[in-house]
Amino acid sequence: MPEQQYDTFSKFGKSFQEKLVKTILFDRNFANQMEEVLDTSYLELKYLQVFVDLLFQHKQSYPHPTYEAMVSVVRTQTEDYSDSIIKQVIEFMARIKSNAI
């Protein structure tokens, strides 16, 4: 029986995936479209999945978050995730802020 394959963005690499998530954060219209079609499991990296899940959850109750709002979300709503994942999310956000992505 052939192994079932799942589609992911892994073939596009880490840089592409991080830029995609950065665009979701900063472009509200794009984020609205992606929210309708993006299954976060397509993202290969767990910290990107967590970040996008947190962003989309925030959008359910509040307007599209700013970078600063996401800093607050990450500080207050990540208790269900491991310390290593939270650290990676924080490092990702630091790279966004420093324009390293």
Residue ranges, per PLM feature:
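Noncatalytic partner-interaction/assembly domains of nucleic-acid and motor enzyme complexes
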Residues: 1-101
